[in-house]
Amino acid sequence: MAKKKNKAGDNTIALNKRARHDYFIEEEIEAGLSLQGWEVKSMRAGKANISDSYVIFNNGEAFLFGATIQPLSVASTHVVCDPTRTRKLLLNERELASLFGKANRDGYTLVALSLYWKNAWAKLKIGLAKGKKQHDKREDIKDREWKVQKDRIMKNAHRG
């Protein structure tokens, strides 16, 4: 039997929807993750959460902090599973230097946007982010509501 190809939407493991609400995303970067076996199994089962995760730098390396990958109940018992451990990001030297310089500017941080599969590899989309003020969030909500209202008006106008 032929193997089915994954559709474009099937490869997403976890999304950080709050990131686009709380931050202006200026740049997006794709990074690999250094994972343990039980983490890959749990991610295949969809037990990952990156809602409050961000990137920290330590000794010239980048790490994902705050991501939670819940272990499966059928996972091996001889391995100690820490769901909230910091995971190393796999970036080349040039990408690390660029991100480190950009993230050290005032008001900027690196947040996790999405976790997904690319072929057989788990990838993390990182966003260079600047925090939004409350009035910026209100403007986004107004724009979104106006777009919905405009679409509704156009739909009714076409029915005519």
Curated annotation (Swiss-Prot):
Cytoplasm keyword on record: yes
The cross-references to CDD domains, in alphabetical order and at most eight, read:
SmpB
Q: GO MF annotations for this entry?
A: RNA binding
InterPro entries attached here?
A: SmpB (IPR023620), SsrA-bd_prot (IPR000037), SsrA-bd_prot_CS (IPR020081)
Q: Name one Pfam family in it.
A: SmpB
This protein's GO cellular component annotations are: cytosol
Q: What is its main location?
A: cytoplasm
SUPFAM superfamilies associated with the record: Small protein B (SmpB)
The biological processes this protein is annotated with in GO are: trans-translation
| Subcellular locations according to the entry | Cytoplasm
The alphabetical list of record keywords is: Cytoplasm, RNA-binding
Matching entries from PROSITE patterns are given as: SSRP
Per its UniProt record, what HAMAP family does this chain match? SmpB
Q: What does this protein do?
A: Required for rescue of stalled ribosomes mediated by trans-translation. Binds to transfer-messenger RNA (tmRNA), required for stable association of tmRNA with ribosomes. tmRNA and SmpB together mimic tRNA shape, replacing the anticodon stem-loop with SmpB. tmRNA is encoded by the ssrA gene; the 2 termini fold to resemble tRNA(Ala) and it encodes a 'tag peptide', a short internal open reading frame. During trans-translation Ala-aminoacylated tmRNA acts like a tRNA, entering the A-site of stalled ribosomes, displacing the stalled mRNA.
Its family? Belongs to the SmpB family.
Give the protein name, as stated in the record.
SsrA-binding protein
